[in-house]
């Protein structure tokens, strides 16, 4: 049972139709109950936090699988606690990827413009910086992570990649990265 405020919250973010085809023929196939948002740690033992159903629905019409609830991205990413650079495996992966992209796409260290969408703390852009690239830009909605990336000399715009922010990107990119955006 949920109280009235939880009911309003759920109705606001619950997806009754398939995001691919629009059908309302969705069947719940996995339910992990009510969960807090990832990485949202409480400060006090009795502090209340919002819980969301963590469920996967299957569309009978087009076979798409989707989460039943889409939490407002601003709520999820305003202050995001996970920093990608804490993973040595992740750091090494992006070093290897940068070297591969440099060679495969014949990128020019002085002229090529590289953008990373959902750049977190700049983990995917740092290897390009270390290789001598001058024109890089991270786009990161979490204010704390954008600030951290900028502090580490990785130019990062704090915001979502949406129409109103597109004009802030000064030119066409030669390489666009979006390593972790689909995980959310």
Predicted regions: what is each one?
Residues 3-89:
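N-terminal juxtadomain amphipathic helix
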Residues 1-11, 15, 36, 40-42, ...:
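Class I SAM-binding transferase module
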Residues 54-131:
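Fe-S ferredoxin-like electron-transfer domains
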């Amino acid at each position: 049972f949920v109280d009235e405020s939880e009911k309003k919250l759920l109705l606001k973010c619950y997806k009754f139709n398939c995001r691919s085809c629009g059908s309302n023929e969705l069947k719940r196939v996995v339910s992990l109950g009510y969960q807090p948002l990832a990485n949202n740690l409480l400060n006090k033992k009795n502090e209340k936090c919002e819980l969301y159903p963590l469920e996967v629905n299957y569309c009978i019409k087009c076979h798409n699988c989707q989460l039943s609830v889409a939490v407002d991205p601003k709520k999820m990413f305003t202050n995001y606690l996970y920093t990608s650079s804490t993973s040595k495996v992740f750091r090494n992966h992006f070093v290897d990827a940068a070297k591969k992209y440099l060679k495969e796409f014949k990128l020019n260290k002085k002229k090529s413009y590289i953008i990373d969408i959902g750049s977190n703390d700049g983990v995917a852009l740092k290897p390009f910086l270390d290789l001598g690239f001058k024109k890089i830009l991270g786009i990161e909605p979490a204010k704390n992570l954008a600030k951290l990336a900028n502090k580490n000399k990785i130019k990062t715009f704090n915001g979502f990649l949406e129409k109103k922010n597109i004009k802030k990107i000064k030119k066409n990119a030669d390489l666009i990265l979006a390593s972790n955006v689909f995980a959310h």
